[in-house]
């Protein structure tokens, strides 16, 4: 059911995109008054360059701003691209715009200006009706887990498959595998309330990964967890990343970020202040166990 | 779509949210019960009021010397007058028999029949009795009404005006009271159901939010809720009907054999009542849960 629709979207996207690149030169009129023009030297993130769309990037932000109706600035002209199979940290203090990026990516709301593309789809062109189908291609993990309290661990993960119209047989085949991968085989019939925070977050990751999405978003996935449990979750995300999924993690756990040594995008009051693409990356071929040892400082 | 999945989902949800489900069930039961009692009561009251109003008659008294031929002429005249619904003839002899029953000594002492032939005229509407009266009065008050019946053999026409007005006022009051009560009850029931639905949905707002995040379509989320509303409505309605049936068998049926009053006015019979109540319970709770969800689906 889903693939033909997706094909259709892709084709339509491409056609519109061609028509659009000519007209799109900056639609900033609506929110001009929020922009403070003084004492700012233009940096890379400010210039909206019409570069050709990179087919390798899965997330592509161009001059994206988000101003909330309260007057708060969520994001201010952010431009960045995330490549397929990359593991990217989004860091910054509370209110810096990390969550805004995440919420824009799941199309919870529209940007005030700028353009977001995910896997080649311009998000502004996905109609409200199509949002559910779009979201099935994105796994999301939150600080507060967001599990369904009335369902067992198994059923929580199965739900992500059920919404896509998966058959009972598919679910029977898939769910136990995913739960084994996330180390929850023994907790199959427990309800979320009976699990520890770390276990609940594992269920959330398992659910996010159930459809094998090309992109996984994690908003403060370790925010409520102790350091050792956090390492376990990061290992899990790393394993998923190694399986080919692009992972975008928003966090303020600078310790963890420093140890993981992956690409870091730093936000401050909605502005991108650092994009460490050239930073010294940690080894990308280490095993999950090796990563765990490194994070524990062994 | 997969109805089996949705049915299982709604059953699971009812089981896992036992307390809100029970609250919804109880409110549907109570509302259905109240309406189920109220429909026949309103009908009976209206029937009774109308029966009382139907007794507003205009009596046309003939001269005591009137012959059968005079009576026949008068009868046709009266029947042709506007606003007259029906005419009942009470002959001298019948009147005497009736009155003698009430007061046998007096009539025996009298020794002859002082009563005239009488026509009991029923106006087509209780409020029209004054018009009928005017038409049947010969030149009543010096200003003859157009089309008035002029028959020299009619001695007098009467309806006790004060009595009629009293009856009309009282029955109108009863009808208005019942209407106000019915409106109040319906509003109260609707508020009760709306509140229950909103409460149980509010507790699941987060659940809906999570479902949307995982990529569930609106109808994928909505179907189990709608089915749940349908089941709860059906169960609550059925329970209310069982209670009503028990009440009818034990209370009403035994009463009606004792007091003829209860059974007299035409009320809705039990089967249509059941169908109406069931349809109301199910549709209100199904639509209610389906529609109230809409607000939470906006994410």
Enumerate the language-model features and the residues they cover.
Chain A
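Helix-to-loop junction immediately C-terminal to a conserved catalytic motif
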Residues: 106
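Conserved catalytic motifs of ABC-family nucleotide-binding domains
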Residues: 212
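ABC ATPase NBD coupling module
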Residues: 123-139, 168, 240-242, 283-286
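Conserved ABC ATPase signature
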Residues: 191-195, 199-201
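Catalytic Walker B motif of ABC-type/P-loop ATPase nucleotide-binding domains
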Residues: 216-219
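Short coil-to-helix segment of the ABC ATPase nucleotide-binding domain corresponding to the Q-loop/switch region
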Residues: 151-158
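Conserved ABC transporter NBD signature motif
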Residues: 114-122
